[in-house]
Amino acid sequence: TYKSSDFKNENLRNKAFRKLFDLHSSDLLFADNFSPLDIFSKIADVSNEFEKEVKEIGDKIVDKITEIGIEYKPCHQDLYFGNFVIHQDETYLIDWEYSAMGDVYFDYADLFWQNEFDLNKSLRNKALEEIGVLDNEKIEKFEYFEILSMITWGLWALKRSSNDENGMEALNKALDLFYDKKL
């Protein structure tokens, strides 16, 4: 199983990217059982002022992503390091519970956020280059999906435990990034 630090290794990172590229360019069709474009609004507790604010921001992010444009391709949608496994020098994806047709930008943004690419600016920039997210328009779309990933998994964590520190941290980071964008 990969460790978060394995994405610092260019060879392992590129094997993971290759696995995602192969998935995204495949002819697979997934049922629409999980969509990051709306799941956050279904799990947010709008009687809680903080979660209500997060939901409203999520709605604005989805509006912006929709305005930019969404492509639907086969996506894994849960790309924390433990879902990448190495067997006989090959990288595989496991845990397909949330797979569905979605935008590849969510997959990559989710991978970056869940594996802390943001903690190393050089790694983040190199990895963005490796996946072809180079111009400002692509970076903007990627960043919106990154915020959406934080909102989705942050709310998900709070549903499991209302005191989940990682969930609160993800949501607070999403809010900070959103307000920095001044939407």
PLM features per residue range, with description:
Residues 105-134, 147-165:
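Active-site activation/catalytic loop segments of kinase-like enzymes and analogous catalytic loops
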Residues 82-109:
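Catalytic activation segment of kinase domains across protein kinase-like and atypical kinase folds
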Residues 26-77, 81-82, 87:
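An alpha-helical support segment within catalytic cores of ATP-dependent transferases
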Residues 10-17, 121, 125, 168:
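Non-membrane alpha-helical structural segments and their capping/turn regions in soluble enzymes
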